[in-house]
Curated annotation (Swiss-Prot):
Superkingdom in the source lineage: Eukaryota
Record-annotated membrane-spanning stretches: 55-75, 97-117, 132-152, 155-175
Membrane-protein topology: Multi-pass membrane protein
InterPro entries tied to this protein: Mpv17_PMP22 (IPR007248)
Role according to the record: May be involved in the metabolism of reactive oxygen species.
Family matches, as PANTHER family: PEROXISOMAL MEMBRANE PROTEIN 2, PXMP2 MPV17 (PTHR11266), PEROXISOMAL MEMBRANE PROTEIN PMP22 (PTHR11266:SF86)
UniProt xrefs under Pfam families: Mpv17_PMP22
Subcellular location: Peroxisome membrane
Keywords assigned by UniProt, alphabetized: Membrane, Peroxisome, Transmembrane, Transmembrane helix
Cytoplasmic side: 1-54, 118-131, 176-190
Name of protein: Peroxisomal membrane protein PMP22
Gene Ontology cellular-component terms listed: peroxisomal membrane
Length: 190
């Protein structure tokens, strides 16, 4: 009797999918991590019944935009800088990411969260963004450059979006709790 090939572990299957279908795998990973992050943040913020619509909308945003945007951004940077990982090149990559993709991601998330998830009128969302976006972005700049440095210096290209998605898991909890506290503060002020 012939022996059957050993079964692949979940990690091996995931890595195989990442190799064969990198964009799809990164998009799904970003979406799943964003959804789980939102469930955790809802529980931490005291919501008794999970708001599935909100979770699904955050999965759609992360899977439809954040994962693919990260995939293409990191791929482009690696091609542009020819895969170099010297200190000067890593610094350039971090600066480029922090001055382009990071502000864009945060701005689009805040717009999406207000208009689509909360169904808040655009004029109110715009006012909220004017008040809170600078603080959110400045806070991101206190630790995301370190994440970027680690990512560009030590993490292979095909894992960079995954690492970023894992960090974004916690960042998403922070942003959600911050957005909720700002909404409550605005409601109390009225």
């Amino acid at each position: 009797m012939g022996s059957s090939p050993p079964k692949k572990t979940t990690l091996q299957r995931y890595l195989s999918q990442l190799q064969q279908h990198p964009l799809r795998t990164k998009a799904i990973t970003a979406g799943v991590l964003s959804g789980v992050s939102d469930v955790v943040s809802q529980k931490l913020s005291g919501i008794q019944k999970i708001q599935l619509r909100r979770v699904l909308l955050k999965v759609i945003f992360a899977g439809g935009f954040l994962g693919p945007a990260g995939h293409f951004f990191h791929t482009y940077l690696d091609k542009f800088f020819k895969g170099k990982k010297d200190t000067q090149t890593v610094a350039k990559k971090v600066i480029l990411e922090q001055l382009t993709l990071s502000p864009l991601n945060h701005l689009l998330f805040m717009i999406y969260y207000g208009v689509v998830i909360e169904r808040t009128p655009w004029t109110l969302v715009r006012e909220r963004i004017k008040k809170t976006y600078p603080t959110v972005q400045l806070t991101a700049w206190t630790f995301f450059p370190v994440v970027g440095w680690i990512n560009y210096k030590y993490v292979p290209l095909h894992f960079r979006v995954i690492l970023h998605s894992l960090v974004a898991f916690f960042w998403g909890i922070f942003l959600t709790l911050r957005a909720r506290s700002m909404t409550l503060a605005l409601a109390k002020a009225k």
